[in-house]
């Protein structure tokens, strides 16, 4: 799955290895210089992988299993980039095959380890932001006026949507991911909100406008390759999520043609292409100065997961949630991003800082490196983790109830950080975030996101105290990523 995005790096490494070997021995060298790892992990879906080595003699390569085949010559001389093809694993258990590389009298072994499918998702639309059942429940609540706050939120939504009917999409067609997300906020929010308006009113004018916005962006942007930097896939994921949600809400509603669906999903596949580039870029650069579990990495798997759900692709879903081929899959992110008492923080934190406690989030180090952005970035990480968990929950995998082998659970994060937004005091608890009070809620860290905490942890006293504190207006609380946050907890009708 990593094939096409590493070619230039691979060739450079091969040339470097060749130069080093030539400098150390002018005679024929029959040692094998591996550029590939000795062990290669492949997801259950299989696919293509590159094996790289240098040999200054004739060489051969072979496999000891039938499920690994070669798309390249199996013998040659000198530099070698061998494309192997691994079949989907339908055996029901993890398996391993061995590649044997013979060069002169030397042999090197590469182990190919392939996992089994562990994630069974019940595909349904909609499910990425809301399920059909949730949408119909909100519609019933509005019609019955059974919740004043939900009704007021609905009225706010419809005001936005009626204005959005006059909106004309103007897609950003440059290659800068930062500008992409900036330009996507309004069209993304409009498309998602209009899709909601369609569900609540059944008036197709809202659906048609939503689809028009998405398809305009799809046609303009589907062939763009973005500048590969540390933020590329993160910005694309966050920018595209609302439009993916809108598509998910409308794809089964007889409001778009097959051609339109193809135009849109062809564009959505940028999430995989750019996601894989970013995953590889972060891994090969030691996570850009040892930022091992932070919001960018959550966004990488979140983007591939939402693409998999939008297109009913089990292999992408498995890769995002639980795959040895993904160095930061969702399960690893849950255990890595969430601290337990005594965990080792990011090495970029200042020496002598208060030790992390249960429920804190790895991105807190932004208090030191931001500076004074610890609460902003822990909120972002929690938002992305929770949005990812909600997608899984809506498709039958409850990650809100999941506790990692080392004890981490999303509930701890909601409960730890809710007190900061209830008191609006960054100096409480350990004092680590002291100095951030003036910035709280001003950089996207909307307390309304805790409606998601209320939805999945309705018995949590800290979360309930925040929701009822009056710190934020529940009816008007709005996030570019999620829209009106009150709808997220509509089932908890207090």
Where are these regions (language model features)?
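Bacterial N-terminal signal peptides that target proteins for export
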Residues: 1-10
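Bacterial Sec-dependent N-terminal signal peptides
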Residues: 13, 18-39, 103-121
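Solvent-exposed, low-complexity, repeat-rich "mucin-like" stalks and linkers
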Residues: 25-28, 33-62
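Short, solvent-exposed loop/turn segments enriched in Ser/Thr/Gly
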Residues: 45-51, 90-98
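Surface-exposed binding patches on compact interaction domains or structured appendages
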Residues: 54-83
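A short beta-strand micro-motif common to beta-rich folds, especially ectodomain repeats
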Residues: 82, 92-105
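Extracellular glycan-targeting catalytic surfaces
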Residues: 118-290, 298, 302, 321-328, ...
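Flexible internal linker/loop segments at domain or repeat junctions
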Residues: 334-370
């Amino acid at each position: 799955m990593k094939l096409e995005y590493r070619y230039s790096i691979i060739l450079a490494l091969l040339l470097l290895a060749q130069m080093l070997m030539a400098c150390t021995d002018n005679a024929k060298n029959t040692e094998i210089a591996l550029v590939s790892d000795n062990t290669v992990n492949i997801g259950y879906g299989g696919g293509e992988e590159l094996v790289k080595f240098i040999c200054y003699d004739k060489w051969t390569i072979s496999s000891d299993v039938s499920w690994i085949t070669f798309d390249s010559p199996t013998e040659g001389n000198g530099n070698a980039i061998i494309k192997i093809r691994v079949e989907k694993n339908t055996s029901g258990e993890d398996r391993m095959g061995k590649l044997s590389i013979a060069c002169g009298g030397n042999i090197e072994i590469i182990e190919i380890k392939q996992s089994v499918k562990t994630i069974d998702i019940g595909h349904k639309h909609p499910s990425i932001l809301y399920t059909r059942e949730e949408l119909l429940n909100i519609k019933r609540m509005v019609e019955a006026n059974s919740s004043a706050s939900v009704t007021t939120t609905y009225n706010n939504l419809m005001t936005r949507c009626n204005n959005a009917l006059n909106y004309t999409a103007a897609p950003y067609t440059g290659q800068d991911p930062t500008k992409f997300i900036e330009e996507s906020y309004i069209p993304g929010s409009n498309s998602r909100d209009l899709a909601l308006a369609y569900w609540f009113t059944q008036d197709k004018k809202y659906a048609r406008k939503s689809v028009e916005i998405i398809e305009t962006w799809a046609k303009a942007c589907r062939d763009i390759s973005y500048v590969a930097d540390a933020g590329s896939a993160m910005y694309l994921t966050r920018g595209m999520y609302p439009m993916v949600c809108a598509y998910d809400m409308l794809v089964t509603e007889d409001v778009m043609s097959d051609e339109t669906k193809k135009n849109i999903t062809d564009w959505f596949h940028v999430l995989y292409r750019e996601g894989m580039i970013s995953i590889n870029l972060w891994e090969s650069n030691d996570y850009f100065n040892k930022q091992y579990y932070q919001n960018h990495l959550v966004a990488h798997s979140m983007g591939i997961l939402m693409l998999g759900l939008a297109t009913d692709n089990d292999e992408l879903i498995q890769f995002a949630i639980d795959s040895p081929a993904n160095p930061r899959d969702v399960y690893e992110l849950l255990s890595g991003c969430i601290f337990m008492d005594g965990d080792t923080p990011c090495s970029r934190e200042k020496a002598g800082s208060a030790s992390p406690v249960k429920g804190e989030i790895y991105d807190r180090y932004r208090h030191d490196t931001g500076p004074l952005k610890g609460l902003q970035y822990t909120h972002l990480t929690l938002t992305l983790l929770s949005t990812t968990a909600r997608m899984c929950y809506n498709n039958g995998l409850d990650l809100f109830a999941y506790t990692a082998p080392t004890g981490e659970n999303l509930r701890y994060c909601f409960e730890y950080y809710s007190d900061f937004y209830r008191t609006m005091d960054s100096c409480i608890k350990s004092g680590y975030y002291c100095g951030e009070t003036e910035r709280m809620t001003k950089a996207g860290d909307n307390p309304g996101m805790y409606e998601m905490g209320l939805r999945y942890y309705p018995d949590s006293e800290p979360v309930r105290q925040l929701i009822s504190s009056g710190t934020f207006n529940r009816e008007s609380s709005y996030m570019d990523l999620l829209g009106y946050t009150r709808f997220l907890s509509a089932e908890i009708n207090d």
